[in-house]
Every structure is written in C-alpha cells, then in structure tokens.
Regions:
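Charge-dense, helix-prone N-terminal extensions
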Residues: 1-138
Length: 138
C-alpha cells in the first residue's frame, strides 16, 4: 500500500506515548473517526516531511524539536472536531470563515455537521504550514 494511509501507518508504528494514532482514532465515535482520518491523511499526504507523533495521547504534526516552534494537532469531542495550532493570529484571522465554529486561543472547534468548514480548515492548515516554511507536496 502506498500514499497517505501507508505513510500514516508507518508513522503510527514509530509513534510514542503508548497508544498509537490508529488506536486513538479507532476509539473515537464514527463522526469523529471520519474527520480525524480525513485531516491526518490530508496533512500526511501533503506535508510528508512533518513528523507525525502522538502528543499527550493525540495526533500531532510537529515542525521542530519542540511544539513551541509550531504544530498542527487534532482532537475530537462528542460533537465537534478541533484543530490546534500555536499560530494564534492565524486562528483569529480565520474566524470569519468558520461561522458555526467556536474558538479557543489556539483552536478552532467545528461541529461535525458543518461539512462546509472542511475546505476552510484545509486552507487554515496550509496557511500554518506555509508560515513555518513547510513545503506542500502536491
């Protein structure tokens, strides 16, 4: 198997912190699994140079040795999917593109039913990566 899924599987094998990313994703409700797989595969497929690991039991793509230098992390709750980044200003600038979301200082919380938010969320991830000089691979 090749492509983003095989990349994620290889990274899962190397993930630390106990539970693998796949185990974490499999433990989520169905809606949460779908969002989590879609966005972890998006990042792994388009940004294969960014290390994928488990951080505090959640999937994270970390740019450098410390998360303080930049990351994209995803978490799932019962009714919403959350994207996290340390780029607080990008989150603030993105607010108008997510009318049904709620926000934290470093997070965008999107209800699973808000399928229209998926494309702006991909673009947010792309903006975070561009800011940190991460090349997009297709």
């Amino acid at each position: 198997m090749s492509g983003p899924l095989s990349t994620l599987n290889a990274m899962n094998d190397a993930a630390s912190d106990g539970e693998s990313a796949e185990q974490y994703i499999a433990s989520l409700p169905e809606d949460a699994q779908a969002w989590m797989r879609e966005f972890t595969e998006y990042v792994a497929g388009h940004y294969p140079t960014v290390p994928y690991l488990m951080f505090r039991g959640r999937p994270m793509f970390k740019f450098e040795g410390t998360y303080l230098k930049g990351y994209v992390m995803f978490t799932a709750a019962s009714k919403h999917f959350t994207a996290h980044a340390i780029d607080f200003d990008l989150i603030e600038e993105s607010k108008p593109r997510f009318p049904r979301a709620s926000f934290g200082k470093g997070s965008i919380k999107i209800p699973y039913a808000d399928l229209d938010a998926k494309q702006p969320l991909r673009e947010f991830v792309d903006a975070v990566m561009a800011r940190h000089g991460v090349p997009r691979d297709r």
